[in-house]
């Protein structure tokens, strides 16, 4: 069983990693592809980034500097001195729910084996892959040698990595199921026809004025919470995710099918 999440635009560069898991740190599997993309980004001036990414001048300046500072080679890989594990660097609603900073070592190791973080720059990351700060959303129309956007750039690469990681978990006797907790923008980079697994997409609905609907802020946090729930309980069978009950959510069988699992939360529990 394997989970995928979207990354976050906001980054936590200041807080130290809370548990000693340095021997599990790794380089991103698709780092050479990231190098190729960063070469393109390094050629962009702040004004170019502002137009490409629809961001403010301040953010364009910040990310232009990040691009210039970004450096990786086989001789000088990412280390604790110049990078940070992805699961600890990403901030925002999803990662508030995941909250790796409060996780013990066993939980972090589970996450590292069962969670892929989709990324415009790095393709797909393990939580303990070392990365340097960046901004490159998957939907960005960055021209490259493969085409006009990042979906064309990544092609089958991300899916190939996920297939291999799912093979690793299924060989341990786990369900061969991908739990999709990523946004549509990011999951579009996974080629469903090439995926050697069934896909389940949890949907989180919150009650508002007597009606249930997806509220982005709550849904993002719930996605992170579900991955954390799986890690805390060392879940290996998808069926056990139906017991997810953090933050007041509960599984609704009559609204679910084999592809979409619906979880709801009543207004009183928000």
UniProtKB/Swiss-Prot annotation:
Single biological process term from Gene Ontology: response to hydroperoxide
Similarity remark: Belongs to the UPF0246 family.
Name of the protein described by the UniProt record: UPF0246 protein PsycPRwf_0637
PANTHER family (alphabetical): PEROXIDE STRESS RESISTANCE PROTEIN YAAA (PTHR30283:SF4), PEROXIDE STRESS RESPONSE PROTEIN YAAA (PTHR30283)
HAMAP family xref list: UPF0246 (MF_00652)
GO cellular component, one term: cytosol
Protein species of origin: Psychrobacter sp. (strain PRwf-1)
